[in-house]
Amino acid sequence: MRPINRIIIHCTATPEGRHHTAAEVRQWHVKGNGWRDIGYHYVIQLDGTRETGRPIETAGAHVRGHNADSIGVVYVGGCDAAMKPKDTRTDAQKAALLCLLRELRTAYPNATIHGHNEFDIGKACPSFDAGKEYATI
């Protein structure tokens, strides 16, 4: 098993309220980016449904230089209708993220929780301060 030191939260950078599946995100990454699979390990749908992406045992493709020891979690949304960054998480997404993060912190107690924007300066993703919001998990 690979070491897990970080859990990194992302958004799909899609408009508020627009549904996208893990299969769609996988296609964006495989066909659009030329990757071999979806970059994230989990996708959180608008209704809070959790879909799996890459297996945890496999390094993701979500933050350059930090994939080997992290888990990538993405929620669907993160932009307003004009494609400006906005925290668009539904109540169901917030609850699902919190539940998943608690599970992951139990499984990987030394892992810290971060937003993508903490590693990639200039990015708004995940459109909220994940490190601050989840600091006490």
Describe the predicted segments one by one.
Residues 59-63:
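Flexible, surface-exposed loop/gating regions in the mature catalytic domains
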